[in-house]
Amino acid sequence: MELLWWVPLVFMGLLCLNLWRLWQRQQIENRLRYGMRLLLLLLCAAGLTFVFTTEGRYRLTKRTVLAGDRAQLQRLGQHLVVGYRDFAEVQKLVQKGGIGGVFITRHNLEGQSVEQLQQQIATLQALRREQNLPPLWVATDQEGGIVSRLSPPLTHLPPLAEVVSQAATPADQYQQVQQYGDTHGRELAAVGINLNFAPVVDLNKGVVTPGDRLSVIYRRAISDDNAVVAAVAQEYCAAMFRHGVRCTLKHFPGLGRLTGDTHLHSAHLDTPVAELAQDDWVPFQQVMQSSQAMTMLGHPILTAVDKQHPVSFSKGVVDGILRQQWQYDGLLITDDFSMGAVFNTRDGATGATIKALNAGVDLVLISYDADLYYPVMAALMQAEQHNRLSLEQLAASRDRLHRHPPITISIPLPPP
């Protein structure tokens, strides 16, 4: 038994060693916890700095724009059509002449009646008259079918494709489309809307892809037959125009073949120009030449012409094809520059707006994210100051806007 005297010593030694290791581990864990807390604190600080810096930059940009030269605001603002959620804010922009139009959609009816919306529009138009400026463009998306932004309370009509497919004869089709356009024109004019982003003249190519969640042209297109689409668009536009509502042919160069969704990301149209000219572009060209229609430019990249820029701000497409080859002298408006296919490009909405106006576009739409108006306007003001805006293109655009003004829809203001 005398030989086992060392056993307790070994046991105590092992116990002390384990306690030492445990203490060291706790120290390490404490340090790790401290480090993680410090890292989390730094990340939170960085996040807050980013938020406040971004918000501060936005507020500074907004103040700079609103304090800008009124003549410059009016000169550049006539090219911008913006959405809004805060009526007081858009009213301030109209008072300064800083925009050329407004976009009305579902949220503008939330919490108020059609009559209240009607009076808001009348108030904005009265402000324009006080400044001796032309009427605002007051636009909406009322295609019928799944894109009927103001239905209800306005009449919800089926898609034009359904009207066409149910027509027994060409004469019946003509009558039905006339009634359809008459309903849209009459109801929109009653609210004070003078520009409808319809009809869709993209051809139905039957393209259905999982990645296309928002464009879904196959559900909105009139037909796969370009002659039918051209005839229906012509009849529809004429019916609306009788009520003072201008139509919009969309979305050049045609979205029916796309597999991507330009609301979310870039998409390429790889079809040869010769094939597009013989098929997809027939409705655009025919109706553009024979009506008062505006034309909306989509955001796909037409790879045969310009591999770098979406059509909406591609000089090769806008100036090269539409203005030069087609000799089109009507109004061109872009699709929303809040969309991913523009916003996520290297140019962003600001650079894209400068390039669009320099290419020969008349109106740039900023509807979903109305806050983009301020950085876009600030960029335009700087571009003008540094001679980066084409004086020739802007002069031609002002001339077109003067020759094709919004139609004045008289809505009386409420008594004071």
State where each predicted segment sits.
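N-terminal hydrophobic targeting/anchoring segments and the immediately downstream early-domain regions
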Residues: M1-H156, S367
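Hydrophobic faces of well-ordered beta-strands that scaffold small-molecule active sites
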Residues: Q78-Y84, G100-I104, L136-Q142, L195-P199, ...
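Short, acidic/polar
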Residues: Y84-K96, Q176-E187, Q278-F284, R346-K355
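Second-shell residues forming the walls of enzyme active-site clefts
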Residues: S113-Q125, V228-L389
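Glycine-rich anion/phosphate-binding loops
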Residues: Q116-Q119, A167-T183, A227-A230, A277
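Glycine-rich, aromatic-flanked loop segments that form ligand/cofactor-binding clefts
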Residues: R128-H156, G181-V207, V229-P253
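A charged helix-plus-loop insertion that forms the helical arch/lid used to bind
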Residues: T155-P170, R219-S223
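Mid-to-C-terminal alpha-helical segments outside catalytic/metal-binding sites
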Residues: A379-Q382, H386-P414
